[in-house]
Amino acid sequence: MRRPKSSHVRMEPVAPRSHNTMPMLDQFRSNHPETSKIEGVSSLDTALKVFWNNQREQLGNFAGQTHLPLSRVRKILKSDPEVKKISCDVPALFSKACEYFILEVTLRAWMHTQSCTRETIRRCDIFQAVKNSGTYDFLIDRVPFGPHCVTHQGVQPPAEMILPDMNVPIDMDQIEEENMMEERSVGFDLNCDLQ
């Protein structure tokens, strides 16, 4: 039997295709188009209410499928030396709670991104989402924030300017004399003949 050339072998993906966004966020966006152009804090509250109502509806249809790997969640839970045994329901429950956390922080960061008229979530958007939330403010020390986050809106950080003291009296005659001395000290004359 002859084997096909390696260039003709079609490789099947090991894992299912990954998405740019989580499917629940896509459903939220498609079910509630009025939240796509939201501005201000009150609209963030509206978006969060719609989001959590949608999550409650989906929770009724929850069949145990999670987007985070349960084996990894179980390993993280077992990494604590005080944990001896883990019930079989705990990884699924913890995974679902992590999904809700990720979705809400992402929604808050997305709202901040849209308020800055951008279409890409950046680290500073996540920082602002955590900072502006009373629930997640304990994470402020864990989310990195640097000076690069200030320039994303086109606003440069203030530069240090050293200005002369404006209250000192200036003698204009002395400045004119210094300028005249500099002009005389030039070492050549343009009108002289070079031979």
Swiss-Prot record:
The keyword DNA-binding applies. The keyword Nuclease does not apply. Residues 1-24 are annotated as: Disordered. GO terms for molecular function: DNA binding; DNA-binding transcription factor activity; protein heterodimerization activity. Keywords: Activator, DNA-binding, Nucleus, Transcription, Transcription regulation. GO terms for cellular component: nucleus. Pfam families: CBFD_NFYB_HMF (PF00808). Its main location: nucleus. It is found in: Nucleus. SUPFAM superfamilies: Histone-fold. PANTHER family: HISTONE-LIKE TRANSCRIPTION FACTOR CCAAT-RELATED (PTHR10252), NUCLEAR TRANSCRIPTION FACTOR Y SUBUNIT C-10 (PTHR10252:SF124). Belongs to the NFYC/HAP5 subunit family. Stimulates the transcription of various genes by recognizing and binding to a CCAAT motif in promoters. Heterotrimeric transcription factor composed of three components, NF-YA, NF-YB and NF-YC. NF-YB and NF-YC must interact and dimerize for NF-YA association and DNA binding. This is Nuclear transcription factor Y subunit C-10. It comes from Arabidopsis thaliana (Mouse-ear cress).
